[in-house]
Swiss-Prot record:
Source organism of the structure: Californiconus californicus
Gene Ontology CC annotations of this record: extracellular region
Protein's name according to its UniProt entry: Contryphan-Cal1
Statement: the UniProt record of this protein carries the keyword NAD: no
Subcellular compartments: Secreted
GO MF: toxin activity
């Protein structure tokens, strides 16, 4: 594997983690105010 491929995979992984994090918070709270309280 080249260094570029590893870098791209890492970025993809981080983006996926961030996205799943957002989805989890969305399930817990319905308004922005509630979301801020959860952080």
């Amino acid at each position: 594997m080249t260094r570029t491929a590893v870098l791209l995979l890492t970025l993809l992984f981080l983006v996926a983690m961030a996205a799943s994090d957002k989805i989890k918070t969305r399930e817990v709270c319905w308004t922005e105010e509630e979301c801020e309280n959860w952080e």
